[in-house]
Amino acid sequence: GXFGPAFHSVSNFAKKHKTA
């Protein structure tokens, strides 16, 4: 994406915690 590592961290966090 365009947001770089910051967005990736949020996406990874959501996947680990299975949140929407």
From Swiss-Prot:
It comes from the Eukaryota. Transmembrane segments: none annotated. GO terms for biological process: defense response to bacterium. Its main location: secreted. GO terms for cellular component: extracellular region. The keyword Membrane does not apply. Disulfide bonds: none annotated. It is found in: Secreted. Keywords: Antibiotic, Antimicrobial, Secreted. Bactericidal against several Gram-positive and Gram-negative bacteria. This is Styelin-B. It comes from Styela clava (Sea squirt).
